[in-house]
Regions:
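Interdomain "pre-motor" coupling segment immediately N-terminal to P-loop NTPase/helicase cores
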Residues: 30-82
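N-terminal pre-P-loop "Q-motif" helix
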Residues: 91-114
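Walker A/P-loop
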Residues: 111-135
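Conserved interdomain linker/interface between the two RecA-like ATPase lobes of SF2 helicase motors
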Residues: 112, 116, 251-314, 318, ...
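Conserved helicase motor
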Residues: 148-156, 160, 170-180, 187-194, ...
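Post-DEXD/H (motif II) to motif III coupling segment of the RecA-like Helicase ATP-binding lobe
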Residues: 197-275, 285, 292
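Conserved RecA-like helicase motor core of SF1/SF2 enzymes
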Residues: 206-209, 344, 348-401, 409-414
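Conserved segment of the helicase C-terminal RecA-like domain
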Residues: 227-242, 391-423
Length: 432
């Protein structure tokens, strides 16, 4: 019996394989002892006493969604093999000098096996900057994965790579088609738990985003899914204290790009005092002040993206706006919206003219020529990082590198002030 090639580089529980397949695989203990405690070998979670089964074994509840790991069973993996060497990059575009510098730095990072952080502003063109390093690894027979905590980021990157690379590309998320073996994989960070020493190069985008940030399980998945001599590259527009510390300690090399690809400055948010949003919302009405701003924006004809702090408020706002603006096509998306992918595409295609969203769309999506309003911008869910990312949706297009970015609030807080200050600093660093 031959090994199924789709199994190479993948990690399996005992029950996922036949007896014949298990005999062909390498074996790992499903759990290990660490300071007297049992720890899951797939997700690195400590096993609690209540996770005990009547059969006399423990199981891991943390990664249960990806099939049960039991202490009385093993984990199995099939060592990754090299791919045929191939020339895969179809993209013939031109990088800006700033992008070229980062691209060259990434090629050097591969040669020197130096883990690297790319800190680039929103709209800098991070995707194009990684093309050369991705192509280099694949051209040499290696395996590459681009991972992100957010499904929207994965979908956007996947579409871009399909256009610009000639090899097959596997897209993996909770609702995707089954995996097939290919030298280029796009996956949510949770999907990395299903790989073991599979990739020569792993690029993690949006490393400051939930659910990746401060998640030891996903940090472990990132470490475990890369070959022992493989390389990790991290991309972000809003760095974290932990990443900055690793740069200071020399554990990460930093490459910075403070300028957008079209050379125009980041849009500076404009804070707008709005104290009656909730009072009117509770009456199923729209604040007259907010309505006047929406009226003015709709006369421009540009699409409008409105961020709401909570799902319930977003749903209420959609109903109210639909009454107030009957000629507009309005949508709402959140983490629990079943047709959110379809609505996002409809907004991108111009079929929806106003889209209301929770922070689920704060990053990883591009809507040409869009204006952005944030209501209750001083809500605790809108962190400095979140507000910077939201602001990054505006002015991304060469056709319209400007746009309105309004933060409606009933009291300026630290997050708003720090977000504005950091955006101003990035423009200054870029010489703009």
């Amino acid at each position: 019996m031959k090994v199924n090639l789709d199994y190479l580089g993948r990690l399996f529980t005992e029950n996922e394989l036949t007896e014949e397949e298990r005999q062909l695989a390498e074996k790992l203990p499903a759990m290990r002892k660490d300071k007297g405690k049992l720890v899951c070998q797939r997700c690195n979670s400590a096993i609690l006493e209540e996770w005990y089964l009547p059969i006399g074994a423990y199981y891991c509840r943390e990664c249960l969604i990806m099939k049960r790991v039991r202490s009385d069973q093993a984990l199995y993996y099939f060592p990754q093999e090299d791919f045929p060497k191939q020339d895969v990059l179809k993209w013939r575009g031109q990088l800006t000098p700033f992008q070229e510098k980062v691209s060259e730095g990434l090629l050097q990072a591969v040669d020197k096996q130096k883990p690297t952080l790319v800190h680039a502003v929103t709209g800098a063109g991070k995707t194009e900057m990684i093309y050369q390093v991705v192509a280099k690894v694949i051209n040499g027979g290696g395996a590459v994965c681009l991972a992100s905590p957010r499904i929207y980021v994965c979908l956007e990157v996947y579409k871009r790579l399909q256009q610009d690379f000639s090899c097959g590309i596997a897209l993996l998320h909770g609702e995707s088609e089954p995996y097939f073996r290919t030298p280029l994989v796009v996956a949510t960070t949770h999907q990395l738990l299903k790989f073991y020493q599979a990739f020569d190069l792993l690029i993690v985008d949006e490393v400051d985003a939930f659910p990746y940030v401060d998640n030891p399980t996903l940090y472990y998945a990132v470490k475990n899914s890369v070959k022992e001599n493989g390389l990790r590259i991290f991309l972000t527009a809003t760095s974290t204290n932990e990443l900055d510390k690793k740069v200071r300690l020399g554990e990460l090399k930093r490459l910075s790009l403070p300028r957008r690809f079209h050379g125009n400055p980041l849009i500076i948010p404009k804070p707008i005092w709005l104290s009656d949003f909730n009072r009117y919302l509770d009456k199923k009405c729209l604040s007259p002040k907010l309505k006047s701003y929406i009226d003015k924006q709709r006369k421009t004809g540009y699409p409008l993206l409105i961020f709401a702090s909570e799902i319930k408020k977003g749903e209420q706002l959609k109903e109210i706006l639909q009454e107030q603006f009957p000629n507009e096509k309005i949508g709402f998306v959140s983490s629990v919206t079943e047709d959110r992918l379809e609505q996002v595409q409809a907004f991108r295609d111009g079929e929806l003219t106003i889209l209301i969203s929770t922070t689920i769309l704060e990053r990883g999506v591009t809507f040409p020529c869009v204006d952005v309003f944030v209501v209750e911008a001083n809500h605790r869910l809108f962190t400095k990082s979140s507000l910077i990312q939201i602001g990054g949706r505006v002015g991304r297009s060469m056709d319209r590198p400007t746009g309105d970015l309004l933060f409606f609030h009933d009291g300026l807080n630290t997050s708003i002030k720090k977000a504005i200050k950091e955006i101003q600093m990035m423009n200054k660093e870029a010489g703009l």
